[in-house]
């Protein structure tokens, strides 16, 4: 039986600590690792793909059981290129991360990290999106031991069709109280736009936002991580509201 093959990507870029530390740990623990990641940070780009310019694949590093490539594209591009171009056969599992910053609740709609894992699930490959609390300790070995156990469990048990796992990890230095299987919480952003002027007098804007968390209970990823639990949320990317389908089917609408 050969080594377990892993495709790693992220939205923080190919030189980010999270992806490089995870790649090294998995390589040292018997996995065959391929990294395909954006050449620069592409955070909050959601599920964008590149259609109107060429994609360029650049080898960064190659050694036994570890190959690293950068592309001038998005996280979802990276998954597609990794599967269709770089790897000889589909990986056993796809991991997006480890992201510097949590991706919880409705944040996942904006997240390049989560969208890359969704892209993997679209291929029918088990996929994880993994995020660590911002400025958390990427050298914490307990985090990698946990992730290895989770990978092994996913490969042993499998995941439901069209489902991925969104994993959010508190900073271990603050203490970890355990692991919870959670549901998505709700976060909204109150956007503010700061107006400035360039040297030619033309105005431009920086967008900033204040987070508001609403109606979150103990079952949610948001509350669980706040209380020191690692959150594992199964995400199914069928966005259909089936209750609304039943209701709308009774509407009388004619052409």
From Swiss-Prot:
It catalyses: a ribonucleoside 5'-phosphate + H2O = a ribonucleoside + phosphate. Binds 1 divalent metal cation per subunit. It is found in: Cytoplasm. A divalent metal cation binds at residues 11-12, 43, 99. InterPro entries: SurE, SurE-like_Pase/nucleotidase, SurE-like_sf. It holds the Pfam family SurE. Its cofactor is a divalent metal cation. The keyword Disulfide bond does not apply. Keywords: Cytoplasm, Hydrolase, Metal-binding, Nucleotide-binding. PANTHER family: 5'-NUCLEOTIDASE SURE, 5'_3'-NUCLEOTIDASE SURE. Nucleotidase that shows phosphatase activity on nucleoside 5'-monophosphates. Belongs to the SurE nucleotidase family. This is 5'-nucleotidase SurE. It comes from Caldanaerobacter subterraneus subsp. tengcongensis (strain DSM 15242 / JCM 11007 / NBRC 100824 / MB4). The gene is surE.
């Amino acid at each position: 039986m050969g080594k377990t093959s892993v495709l790693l990507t992220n939205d923080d870029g190919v030189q980010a600590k999270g992806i490089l530390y995870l790649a090294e740990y998995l390589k040292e623990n018997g996995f065959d690792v391929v990294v395909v990641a954006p050449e620069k940070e592409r955070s909050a780009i959601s599920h964008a793909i590149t259609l109107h310019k060429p994609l360029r694949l650049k080898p960064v590093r190659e050694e036994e059981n570890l190959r690293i490539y950068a592309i001038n594209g998005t996280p979802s591009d990276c998954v597609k290129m990794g599967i269709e171009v770089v790897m000889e056969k589909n990986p056993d599992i796809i991991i997006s991360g480890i992201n510097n910053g949590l991706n919880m609740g409705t944040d996942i709609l904006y997240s390049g990290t989560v969208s890359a894992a969704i892209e993997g699930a679209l291929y029918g490959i088990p996929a994880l999106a993994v995020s660590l609390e911002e400025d958390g300790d990427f050298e914490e070995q307990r985090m990698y031991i946990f992730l290895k156990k989770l990978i092994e469990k996913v490969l042993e048990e499998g995941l439901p069709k069209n489902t991925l796992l969104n994993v959010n990890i508190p900073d271990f230095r603050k203490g970890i109280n355990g692991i919870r299987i959670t549901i998505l919480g709700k976060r909204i952003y109150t956007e503010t736009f700061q107006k400035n002027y360039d040297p030619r007098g033309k105005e431009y804007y920086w967008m900033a936002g204040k987070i508001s968390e609403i109606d979150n209970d103990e079952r949610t990823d948001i509350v669980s991580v706040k209380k020191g639990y690692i959150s594992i949320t199964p995400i199914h990317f069928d966005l259909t509201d089936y209750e609304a389908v039943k209701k709308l089917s009774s509407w009388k609408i004619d052409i």
